[in-house]
């Protein structure tokens, strides 16, 4: 007889074990403690729980893993076509499970109102055309009635509403959808936050809102920066553009992530990604956004089974049966970032520095209880699969330390920094032979880093 077929519970996470077996040549003193979302008062971190409206994943499979991740927000898609299969009759049971299932874990849902509905001759796919919705009075009226029903149902739990997803340069039709939808939401829920997806149509939509005197309808402008190097597309130009129309506008990195395998379609396709580079990519995206004060949503919590493929962006690996296989290294990395960088950690911004490394290095500065915290990483190239660190002499300006420790943020390993290898002079600190690589490492005061001795499984 042959060997029994493995079940999802018997698979080993090979890449996670290799991450744990690697590390800088420093003395490990523990592992950074993780936090459940219930134990974090507030933060700007979000994770994607998208595509449940099209059954590309099952919420019940990963529900508990969202709270364990430590994020305080999660993005859902409302699924007009799934909620209204018969004209005028709404079934929100499936969405109730998601909204209230997140809320009970102290994770605040934010909802993207989308897509079209075949019973009103509009489509429900990614990139769905808006023309059938806005150029038919019956369909637009039905859409607004659906929005009203959705907002009224969840307004005690949800106050952040994104209008459509990735309208793909349909600026005239998107503006025609945005204005009545946003006006309705603001009427139904005066404290609501309206988010607009940017996808090649920002300026024309802004111009139309300005012409109509409706700039106040929008609070956040969302962008989806899928770039091979996560340190590109940092949002500064986008922020400058939208704030030139209204200083109240804020930007939101509402969807970005990295595949864990070479994909042949969707964002980031045709590049040989792995679970090693995925983990580095996600953490660099998070660190770069957070340094700039940009709220961030990581795409996505679990692999998505599209009709023609199994997409590998998930922090959790799943199979074609929607079964959970294992948490990828990226899951642990996001967990460590979300657990430490809550709203008690204040943003300082990018810090000036000097190093003897030929590679471009980013140093992000923060403060926790008035004490310095920094994230440091190579930011010049696409994340590699290498599990090796370079010894670098680094002087950080504007960061003083008294008893620093070194944290590798993917594995969460905490290391001693020998006293002979660092010194603080005034507000600057110099480290000798500090191990750096193309993923964020954190330096923080020992007293600020809650540790555990347990090895992470």
What are these regions (language model features)?
Residues 395-415:
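Solvent-exposed beta-hairpin/edge-strand motifs
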Residues 66-217:
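Substrate-binding cleft and catalytic face of glycoside hydrolase catalytic domains
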Residues 1-69, 79, 447-457:
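Mature N-terminal, pre-catalytic/accessory segment of carbohydrate-active enzymes
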Residues 171-288, 292-296:
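Noncatalytic carbohydrate-binding groove/subsite architecture in carbohydrate-active enzymes
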Residues 258, 264-342, 348-360, 369:
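Aromatic/acidic polysaccharide-binding cleft in carbohydrate-active enzymes
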Residues 353-401, 440:
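Carbohydrate-binding surface patches
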Residues 26-33, 56-64, 93-98, 143-150, ...:
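Alpha-helical scaffolding within the catalytic cores
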Residues 416-457:
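C-terminal beta-strand-rich structural cap/linker in extracellular carbohydrate-active enzymes
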């Amino acid at each position: 007889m042959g060997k029994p077929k493995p079940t999802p519970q018997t698979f080993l996470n090979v890449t996670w074990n290799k991450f744990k077996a690697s590390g800088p040549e420093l003395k490990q003193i523990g592992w950074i403690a993780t936090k459940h979302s219930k134990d974090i008062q507030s933060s700007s971190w979000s994770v994607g729980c998208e595509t449940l409206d099209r059954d590309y994943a099952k919420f019940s499979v990963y529900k508990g893993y969202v709270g364990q991740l430590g994020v305080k927000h999660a993005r859902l898609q409302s699924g007009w076509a799934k909620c209204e299969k018969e004209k005028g009759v709404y079934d929100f049971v499936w969405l109730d499970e998601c909204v209230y299932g997140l809320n009970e874990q102290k994770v605040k849902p934010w909802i993207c109102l989308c897509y079209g509905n075949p019973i009103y001759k509009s489509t429900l796919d990614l990139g769905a055309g808006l023309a059938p919705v806005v150029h038919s009075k019956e369909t637009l009226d039905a859409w607004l009635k659906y929005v009203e029903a959705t907002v009224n149902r969840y307004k005690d739990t949800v106050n952040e509403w994104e209008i459509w997803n990735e309208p793909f340069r349909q600026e005239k039709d998107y503006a025609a959808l945005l204005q009545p939808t946003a006006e309705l939401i603001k009427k139904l829920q005066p404290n609501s936050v309206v988010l607009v997806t940017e996808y090649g149509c920002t300026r024309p939509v802004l111009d139309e809102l300005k012409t109509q005197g409706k700039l106040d309808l929008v609070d956040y402008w969302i962008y989806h920066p899928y770039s091979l190097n996560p340190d590109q597309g940092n949002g500064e130009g986008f922020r400058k553009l939208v704030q030139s129309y209204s200083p109240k506008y804020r930007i939101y990195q509402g969807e970005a992530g990295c595949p864990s395998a070479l994909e042949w379609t969707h964002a980031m396709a045709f590049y040989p990604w792995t679970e090693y580079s995925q983990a580095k990519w996600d953490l660099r995206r998070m660190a770069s956004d957070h340094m700039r004060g940009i709220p961030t949503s990581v795409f996505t919590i679990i692999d998505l089974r599209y009709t023609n493929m199994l997409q590998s962006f998930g922090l959790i690996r799943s199979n074609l049966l929607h079964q959970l296989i294992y948490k990828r290294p990226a899951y642990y990395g996001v967990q460590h970032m979300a657990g430490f960088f809550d709203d008690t950690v204040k943003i300082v911004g990018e810090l000036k520095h000097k190093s003897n490394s030929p590679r471009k290095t980013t140093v992000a500065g923060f403060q926790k209880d008035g004490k310095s915290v920094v994230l440091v990483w190579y930011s010049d190239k696409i994340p590699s699969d290498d599990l090796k660190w370079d010894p670098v002499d680094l002087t950080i300006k504007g960061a003083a330390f008294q008893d620093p420790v070194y944290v590798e943020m993917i594995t969460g390993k905490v290391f001693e920094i020998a006293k002979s290898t660092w010194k603080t002079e005034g507000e600057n600190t110099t480290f000798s032979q500090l191990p750096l690589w193309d993923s964020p490492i954190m330096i923080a005061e020992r007293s600020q880093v809650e540790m555990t001795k347990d090895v992470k499984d």
